[in-house]
Regions:
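Glycine- and acidic
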Residues: 70-74, 127-132, 240, 256-264
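Active-site acidic catalytic loop and adjacent metal/ATP-binding pocket
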Residues: 37-52, 61, 206-252
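Surface-exposed helix-capping loop/turn segments at secondary-structure junctions
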Residues: 94-99, 153-162, 283-286
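Conserved short submotifs of the Hanks-type protein kinase catalytic core
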Residues: 113-123
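Active-site activation/catalytic loop segments of kinase-like enzymes and analogous catalytic loops
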Residues: 86, 251-285
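Conserved NTP-binding catalytic cores of kinases and kinase-like/nucleotidyltransferase enzymes
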Residues: 1-111, 233-237
Length: 286
């Protein structure tokens, strides 16, 4: 069954077959593209007419390869689409981590096409818009879930058995250094001297930082747990956008979540306590 590569190609007939594992016997009678835009991938919101009741959402968020050919080439090279599909199919069911309810996770190894169709999180959760940070308590809860992921895969043998397709991110790309250089050059006055100093140090010698990351214990990482990849449901947070999973130091996830999910004032006040909390949770989980 060929995979659709544009939102309008997600037909009722295709979706009926695709959701068969998740909701067998459900017939999708209609699909309406409510919204569509290009991001790292191509995103669309689909409204469904179906006979499955609560077994299938009536609104789906759909992630497809980007339509722009340059972006598509970069995405295919990165393996992000396949990695995220495999996460939802192979790992997510066994993890004690909150993730979206996914009804289609498919990848075509010959063409690089992929489809991820999941619940529209806005119907049951708060999806941050990036203007405000999360509370320290929510970040602490998120660190507990990351700790569960990290503990599960700190054993190299288990990683080889369950997730051999997740590998170290390596250091072949200078994308981060180029992005920092462009930001500094575009408007240096908008950045604090402290930030510029750290950025310049990274640009000049990023291998030293990479050496430090690679020196310690390794595990499977989410890889990109910033505020835009989180949702809040009750007193817990959940994680989505798993396309940058990698093997590396667990402190990459920990530091990234603390730095990117808290307001600066909260981070200054609570970051040490949060690091201690993560260590205690790790120790309690073995």
């Amino acid at each position: 069954m060929a995979l659709p590569q544009r939102p309008e190609e997600v037909s009722p007939e295709w979706l009926t077959r695709a959701v068969g594992d998740h909701a067998p016997g459900v017939t999708v009678r209609g699909v309406e593209v409510v919204a569509s835009h290009e991001a790292t991938n191509h995103h669309a919101v689909l409204r469904l007419d179906h006979d499955g009741g609560a077994r299938l959402p009536t609104t789906l968020f759909c992630k497809l390869p980007p339509l722009d050919p340059v972006r598509r080439t970069r995405l295919d090279w990165s393996g992000m689409g396949e990695r995220e599909v495999r996460f939802y199919r192979e790992l997510a069911p066994g993890l004690d981590v909150r993730v979206p309810r996914v009804v289609v996770a498919a990848h075509d190894g010959d063409t690089g096409a992929f489809v991820l169709a999941m619940e529209d999180l806005r119907t049951r959760a708060d999806v941050p818009d990036g203007t405000d940070g999360l509370s320290p308590d929510l970040v602490a809860a998120g660190l507990e879930d990351l700790a569960a992921l990290h503990v599960r895969y700190e054993d190299a043998g288990r990683r080889r058995r369950e997730a051999p397709w997740i590998t170290p991110s390596g250091r072949t790309s200078d994308y981060g250094a180029r992005l920092l250089r462009a930001g500094i050059d575009a408007d240096p006055g908008a950045l604090s001297p402290a930030f510029v100093a750290v950025a310049e140090r990274y640009i000049a010698d990023r291998d030293t930082l990479q050496d430090a990351w690679e020196a310690g214990p390794a595990t499977v990482l989410h890889g990109d747990p910033h505020l835009g990849n989180l949702f809040v449901a009750g007193d817990r947070i959940g994680f989505y956008d798993w396309g940058l999973m990698a093997v590396g130091s667990p402190l990459r996830d920990v530091s990234y979540l603390i730095a990117m999910a808290l307001d600066p004032a909260d981070r200054a006040t609570h970051e040490r306590d949060l690091l201690t909390h993560y260590r205690e949770v790790r120790a309690a989980q073995g």
